[in-house]
């Protein structure tokens, strides 16, 4: 609804991270996307798809420990309907090990050019993933948004869409009239967004 001219490709990812990365890298080669957006585990994968503009939303860069700390072992129900019809997955210690090994590959090819291509959006009330500081060690374009781990429509409209629009404008050589307001103006004493940020 927000971007009627955009073609969105959102395949089901294999549960095993090596298979997921292979699928994603092949998609990048065949589809040549203008922008890749990934949330949570998808944000972790997105960071490693070098050479393309990317937005990592609440990226799970510590997926192995996130699984154990958030009590995600055993049977888990998918929160979104999958194209393959699968409803659940069994998370084992072996799978957690695979995720730990995959996350060790994050940030392996960060360059000054890559830093300009990657944006991080982090929910200020995310109870699951806390990787803002880790992301900021490697990339400078990171913000907190008012929200939790899952993206809701309000967060998409107020935070994700402006970043998408900014990237699209940059890619197309468009320049919009802009008034810049310091983030300090819209943050409380703890650096969290004030309610006025949503108005």
What do the predicted segments below correspond to?
Residues 172-199:
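Eukaryotic N-terminal low-complexity, Ser/Thr- and Lys/Arg-rich leader segments
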Residues 47-53:
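Glycosyltransferases and closely related glycan-assembly transferases
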Residues 1, 46, 131-135:
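Short, highly selective alpha-helical patches that border small-molecule cofactor pockets
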Residues 15, 39, 121-125:
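Structural motif
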Residues 37-47:
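Gly/Ala-rich beta-loop-alpha elbow adjacent to hydrolase catalytic centers
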């Amino acid at each position: 609804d927000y971007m009627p001219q955009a073609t969105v490709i959102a395949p089901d990812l294999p549960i095993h991270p090596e298979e997921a990365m292979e699928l994603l890298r092949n998609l990048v080669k065949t589809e040549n996307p203008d922008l890749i957006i990934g949330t949570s585990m998808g944000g972790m994968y997105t960071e490693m798809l070098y050479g393309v503009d990317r937005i990592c939303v609440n990226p799970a860069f510590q997926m192995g420990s996130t699984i154990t700390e958030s009590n995600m072992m055993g049977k888990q129900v998918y929160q979104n309907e999958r194209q393959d019809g699968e409803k659940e997955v069994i998370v084992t210690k072996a799978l957690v090990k695979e995720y730990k090994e995959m996350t060790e590959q994050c940030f392996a090819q960060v360059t000054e050019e890559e830093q300009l291509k990657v944006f991080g959006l982090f929910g200020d009330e995310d109870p699951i993933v806390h990787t803002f500081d880790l992301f900021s060690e490697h990339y400078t374009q990171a913000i907190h948004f008012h929200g939790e781990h899952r993206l809701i429509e309000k967060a998409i409209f107020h935070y994700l869409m402006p970043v998408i629009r900014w990237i699209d404008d940059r890619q197309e050589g468009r320049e919009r009239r802009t008034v810049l307001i310091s983030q300090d103006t819209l943050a409380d004493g703890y650096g969290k967004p004030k309610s006025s940020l949503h108005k």
